[in-house]
Amino acid sequence: PKEYYGFINELATWIHSADPGHPVAIGNGDILFLDLIAKHAPAIDIFGANAYRGWHGFGRSFFEEVQRWLAKPVLITEFGCPAYQAGRPRETAETGQAMYHLGSWVDLADNMAGRGVGNVLGGIVFEWSDEWWKAGQPPRFSPTVQETHPNWAGPFPGGWNFEEWYGLVSQGNGALSPFLRQLRTSYQLYQELWKRF
């Protein structure tokens, strides 16, 4: 990893020389290797991370650790939750997805400038629409069928990740895919949150 972060630092330095008017961010997996980033990539301006930590959000310690090691602003470059839970009704799964997103939204808002740790720039929801090709390769898995095979255990409602079910909108039953978009409960949640924020 130190070679990787050293290379990131070289890139950030070059970008700054070519375009000093824009910040340079890194996309990291959660808060792994903060010590190495601090030592080998000081030229980055923004710490970005893909983080999937559960319905409660990211946890204050996430933002505190970034502040302690890097003293840089944080952008959550990817967060989300599947809208499928094995053996549970669709409505239950969608509500679980929405509550997960709500926890993430609240945690981000509570740690923006002037609040909490104060180092959050924002977050990027993963993702707009379900992707039916992510469960695995043909012939075992089909891109024309939304798979319900769990990919790995994780901090999600029901305890499992279902990679093809992250969308704020679904593709329905697939008869009109890839063009049909059906709004999920989490889409409606964000619609309301943006009105109030």
Where do the model's predicted regions map?
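Extracellular glycoside hydrolase catalytic/binding regions
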Residues: 1-110
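Glycine-centered small-residue hotspots that permit tight backbone geometry or close packing
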Residues: 10, 27, 48, 80, ...
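A structural motif corresponding to the C-terminal end of an alpha-helix
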Residues: 10-22, 107-120, 181-197
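Compositionally biased, low-complexity repeat tracts
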Residues: 17, 23, 76, 118, ...
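Arginine residue identity/basic-tract feature
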Residues: 53, 60, 68, 88-90, ...
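Active-site/pore-lining binding-face segments in mid-to-C-terminal subdomains
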Residues: 89-141
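Aromatic-rich peripheral "rim/lid" segments of glycoside hydrolase catalytic domains that contact
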Residues: 126-197
